[in-house]
Amino acid sequence: MSELNIDAEAFKARVELLHGKYREFENEPNSMVFALGSSNPENPYQKTTALHYWLMGYEFPATLIVFTPGKVVIITSGPKAKHLEKVVELFKNNNNGVELEIWQRNNKDVEHSQKLFKDIIELINTAGKTVGIPEKDVYEGKFMKEWKPIWDAAIKEHEFKLVDISAGLSSTWEVKDDKEKAYISIASKCSDRFMNLLSDEMVRAVDDELKITNSKLSDKIENKIDDLKFLKKITNDLSAMCPPNHKFTLDLLDWTYSPIIQSGNKFDLRVSAHSNNDQLHGNGCILASCGIRYNNYCSNTTRTFLIDPSEEMVNNYVFLLDLQKHIIENELKAGRTGKEVYESVVEFIKKVRPELAGNFTKNIGSLIGLEFRDSFFVLNSKNDKRKIQVGDCFNISFGFNALKDMKTNTNYALQLADTVILNEDGPKILTEYTKSKSQVSFYFNNDEVEKEKKPAASTKIPTNLDGNSKILRSKLRGDARGESQDAQKEQIRKENQRKLHEKLQKEGLLRFTAEDATTEGSETRQYFKKYESYVRESQIPNNVRDLRIHVDWRSQTIIVPIYGRPVPFHINSYKNGSKNEEGEYTYLRLNFHSPGSAGGISKNVVELPYDDSPDNQFMRSITLRSKDGDRMSETFKQITDLKKESTKREQERKALADVVQQDKLIENKTGRTKRLDQIFVRPSPDTKRVPSTVFIHENGIRYQSPLRTDSRIDILFSNIKNLIFQSCKGELIVIIHIHLKNPIMMGKKKIQDVQFYREASDVSVDETGTGRRNQNKFRKYGDEDELEQEQEERRKRAMLDKEFKYFADAIAEASNGLVSVESTFRDLGFQGVPNRSAVFCMPTTDCLVQLIEPPFLVVNLEEIEVAILERVQFGLKNFDLVFVYKDFKKPVTHINTIPIESLDFLKQWLTDMDIPYAISTINLKWSTIMQSLQEDPHQFFLDGGWSFLNANSDEEGSDESEEEISEYEASEEEPEDESAYSDEDDYSEDISDGSYSGADSEEEEGEDWDELEKKAAKADRTAGLRD
């Protein structure tokens, strides 16, 4: 409990409020007793628990709170008492006639606890015989076993009269202050997000005809509260709603109740309803309820989804919407009792739709806050005492049950619920998830859609679109209207992008401080990497006694005889060497690393092969002469090979630095292990391409090779970052792709993507012309055999998709919320070149992927800082897309040569995904940009951040000079993913390697493709003018 932060001011104000009111409660109690034992998660809405949350913001188990005239006493343990010290001091300075005392009890000292209990009973007895308690509260635990016998005996001994104070407590915390309103608003916003998730899952299940029960779907949504990936998406929006001095915390989010999903012909509109085990019925009405609480303040929302509804259902639902509007705007007024409101609503129904009055619910809601349903203030025909006040918060929930559709003769129900706060300027709905008829109606049977479309098709186009003008903006009136709509969409998109860029700039300034700048500018801090050849002289090989140069492979050492002594030089100290023959002698020159030498270590290399200290002395080179040319050649070859092996080993070590050792896979030894047979894997641990099987175990999945038992791939659920299903629609294979958080080893290879696939088509083509169909030279299109073959292939593809999707869902289900399945949206895809070849890139819910051709592309959208559309110029047929990540050390991702036809779509898609983008007419030099950004990110955002990219965003087709676009130098090279920003990854790499000369040589050979395209376009225009 060390992290508890109790609002002392609120605690004091609320204690004084309750202390001043409790004598006015029904039956006028002389004192109040609140005993809380162990926490009861099964019933979190008891009055004593609510009191703890209202006063302290937390539940203090094993605590006794007693209110008496002039004094409030809290008996609790020592650790809990420490958190109340600040409050005690506040009461001492200004008690307003109320004293607060904290009595500490020791859990191990039973006698001391009993003495405290007897003292508090004596204090209660002094106050009077009438004692107020929440009668329905029931708690258990060790504390209650100690307190209950003593309290029961005291009741008999002192003849205490116990009275229920629940109604009085309800009225005390009825009106919400600003902080409470903020907490309920956050909870309501979160309920909207979960309702959106629930509706997506429900519609997908109905559309795909999945066999899933109402309770199973409910559990799936309920588990999302533990999905940090999902919760992080809503964190920024919810943080902005927090009251002053309160930081949004995901741990304070919890379910008010388990999500409720009802379908079929059994409906329960009471708040105590729950999801049953019947199959989700994809026709008629589906009722869905979600309730989230934040910091223990509840919210609620219920929606009715209409699946292929009849006209009667739609009309009744429209009336339900009108009725809710009438209740909130006209009936929910301060000063009215619950009975007055309810009876007025019933009269309205009888007047407008009398046939529905008998199906109306028995109440239209209740107070909501620390309790989901305050039973002492329900808006029904019985509540004629409590009056509505400004500051009240209600769960307005009502509907019509046991309705019968005349068309289908089936039962259905309609229900709506929203969280509503009553402000001084009127009621405000806090749960804003859509409920309009068009948004909650889904037509999977096209007959109804066609009926609705036919009248619309016959609608006349107005002959005058611009007032009385007969001159139209376009030859076609429809075009003019379309242009107007497109301009409006463009304006909305630009406004959204402006807000996204402003948000990006603010977050950048908050994320980085002046201390984030590298202290040494662009220079990387270098250090000496220690190495050692031998610890003791006895470890030196015996064959060095011949005083010749030797190579010790085991110790990675060159042993050179100097003045009759073997001197070891570790291979890390060796730089390069040369061998020359002059006359009868062969000269072997060995060069060693040393500070200040020509062609030395780059400043970007972190690990130095020497200790650069002014106290150290270095040998830069040594030359050996021998008449035995063959031995010198052999020795030089051994030294060269040892250096290559050492360099290779060091590169492998750096490459595997981010590989994390996985826990062991726990095999499923109980029950039936789910498996997917006849699949192939990429990359494969085997040299031969053979079909195999993947199994789902307790904490992960395992691919088992059929060739060798020790050849397998184990993937833990905790290491899966993205689980993606790609249908075989439009492709030759169906895929389950797994993108990992941390790379794993497959043999000696590091892999971060594993893909299971199966070929979707096994149709063979008869190329000999001897088939029965080929005998008829002039056969008609639509030959029966051909049609049958096509239908069979479509059926196989559908079965294949269903099998792989089911297995992907099984993986997600087995992970217990750690993993969720994403599906690719082919309709939103576009062509591009992320690597060497043109591929089709497709988005999922959270990613942009290319899963057909290796190397695969998986870009997580939540990791993107900004997107840049490069080479957007008039006349060019394609452009490039660059993603910059929030982790500035991560290399940027390029998708090149995207057709210009996809430009508008990508702009809108990036905006919809809340990704700010900028437009450039040239390719920027990203290595320079990212290097300067990493040096001082705080200064980067102080200078405007990514605003330099927007210099040319407004006029996409302008021919501005490169200097006007960016302060950074433009690159004429083909952009590549920068895997590092240094020119030398290893100090041992030879300068004369020539591996970096390719780009320069390409520039010298001739013009690039952009220039050639411009010339070709110019030539075409010239030819057109001549014609």
UniProtKB/Swiss-Prot annotation:
Coiled coil: 8-28, 82-102, 208-233, 484-507, 637-658
Top-level taxon in the UniProt lineage: Eukaryota
Encoding gene per record: SPT16
Subunit structure: Forms a stable heterodimer with POB3. The SPT16-POB3 dimer weakly associates with multiple molecules of NHP6 to form the FACT complex.
Intracellular or extracellular location(s): Nucleus; Chromosome
Keywords for the protein's UniProt record, in alphabetical order: Chromosome, Coiled coil, DNA damage, DNA repair, DNA replication, Nucleus, Transcription, Transcription regulation
A GO molecular-function annotation: histone binding
Signal peptide: none
CC per GO annotation: FACT complex
Primary localisation category: nucleus
SMART domains, per database record: FACT-Spt16_Nlob, Rtt106, SPT16
Acidic residues composition-biased segments: 953-992, 1000-1011
Organism of derivation: Candida glabrata (strain ATCC 2001 / BCRC 20586 / JCM 3761 / NBRC 0622 / NRRL Y-65 / CBS 138)
Gene3D superfamilies according to UniProt: 2.30.29.150, Creatinase/methionine aminopeptidase superfamily, Creatinase/prolidase N-terminal domain, FACT complex subunit Spt16p/Cdc68p, Pleckstrin-homology domain (PH domain)/Phosphotyrosine-binding domain (PTB)
Name the record gives this protein: FACT complex subunit SPT16
Function: Component of the FACT complex, a general chromatin factor that acts to reorganize nucleosomes. The FACT complex is involved in multiple processes that require DNA as a template such as mRNA elongation, DNA replication and DNA repair. During transcription elongation the FACT complex acts as a histone chaperone that both destabilizes and restores nucleosomal structure.
Biased composition (Basic and acidic residues): 1012-1027
Segments of this protein annotated with the region Disordered: 767-790, 952-1027
Family of this protein: Belongs to the peptidase M24 family. SPT16 subfamily.
A single GO BP: nucleosome assembly
